[in-house]
Amino acid sequence: MSKKYSVPESIKLKTHLDEASFDSMYLDSINNPESFWATQASKHITWIKEPNHISSIEMEKGEIEWFNDGILNASFNCIDRHLSNPDALAIIWESDDPSKDKKISYGHLHDEVCKFANLLKNRGIKKGDRVCIYMPMIPEATYAMLACARIGAVHSVVFGGFSVESLKDRILDSNCETVITANEGIRGGKRIPLKENVDKAIKSCPNVHSVIVVKRTGEELNLISKVDVDYLIEKEKFEAHCDCEPMKSEDPLFILYTSGSTGKPKGVLHTTGGYLLGAAITPVSYTHLTLP
């Protein structure tokens, strides 16, 4: 028999739901799923077109759809709807070197994402195109994901510690035409040759027409091909405004590969509306902070 432990008072004070409210919400989600999720979608998502159809679930076929007649944009929901308070804190980035940590406001995030999105569009990337993101854990990785979402491109994040072979396999399998990377990554003081790995991987990826490189360290970018782009230089050629592409709720948002522990890694395609709502209601607490 399992034991039940009480939640410490210090934790209770930081949550946005008490135990009774959570239990009530849970029962409502089980007993009235359509109305429950309709309420959550209206409360947490800003829609271009509100959905009338909430869900379609056929478990035997493995076919599940959420809000399939709704229209929205993930980048808008993550950034633009918060711009009434542009100095509010959007990202706290902890660097490998603690002296270089950053706090990024929604206003700054918006500008960087829009410039990145315009750079992608200038490279011919459009709605539905696949973009591989092979980067260290730096703010530009988030800018890249949100820029893809802004223009309707589908991103596939590949862990920066993966080998050349693993990177190549994921680029080919997801049919990516663009790779976003950095000259190097840093983990625990160790340098990881990301750009070098990309150069090796794309020799077997004929569809890749652009490699956008962020300068993470003081080492040279090693731009050796006509497909290579210096992100820090190129992004400043573009304005900090980019309209959001209207996306159907069931349009693809990103691809994430399984671990491969039971066979070849499989690309799991996540769609926009359902994923976004799940991400929105997951945090235990949420507080708007203002940059000092």
Where do the protein language model's features map onto the residues?
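Conserved small/polar residues in nucleotide/adenosyl-binding loops
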Residues: 258, 287-292
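Hydrophobic alpha-helical segments in the ANL/AMP-binding
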Residues: 77-80, 121, 139-159, 166-168, ...
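Flexible, low-complexity linker/hinge segments
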Residues: 98, 206-208, 219-251, 278
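N-lobe entry segment of adenylate-forming
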Residues: 1-104, 108-111, 115, 197, ...
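Conserved AMP-binding/adenylate-forming core of the ANL superfamily
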Residues: 91-145, 163, 167-168, 223-233, ...
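Conserved structural elements of the adenylate-forming
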Residues: 113-114, 268-286
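Structural core segment of the AMP-binding/adenylate-forming
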Residues: 146, 150-233
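Conserved AMP-binding A3 loop
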Residues: 102-107, 245, 253-277
